[in-house]
Design a protein with these regions (language model features):
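Short, well-ordered beta-strand segments
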Residues: 42-44
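Catalytic core of pol beta-like nucleotidyltransferases
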Residues: 1-26, 32-38, 47-100
């Protein structure tokens, strides 16, 4: 995993704060691969929230807070509502992701 301890702890704290303590968090993509270079911070979350409006608000607030705390980095946040439509990116994230 190519994130510092500070980045890992900050991401986990911020996402659980906005999406609920029961949320499932994964880092996937090139930052999950120690041999890769560069790359966005790709995050997958199955939130503890159920209402679409609450999820949208949580996503916006979490991304703003992460940018303030981690600086200007490209952060991709993939949210799987569980009860929503299945997207292929969910499978990729779950198969290749590392739990935070």
């Amino acid at each position: 995993m190519r994130l510092t301890k500070y980045q890992q702890e900050t991401i986990k704290r911020v996402l659980l704060k906005h999406f609920g303590e029961g949320s499932d968090l994964l880092l996937f993509g090139s930052r999950a691969d120690d041999n890769a270079r560069g790359g966005d911070i790709d995050l997958y979350i199955e939130p503890d929230l159920h209402e679409a409006d609450d999820i949208v608000e949580a996503k916006l607030n979490a991304l703003v807070e992460l940018h303030l705390l981690l600086g200007e980095q490209k952060i991709v946040l993939v949210v799987n509502r569980k009860s929503g439509r299945f997207l292929p990116i969910y499978k990729i994230a779950k198969e290749s992701g590392i739990r935070l």
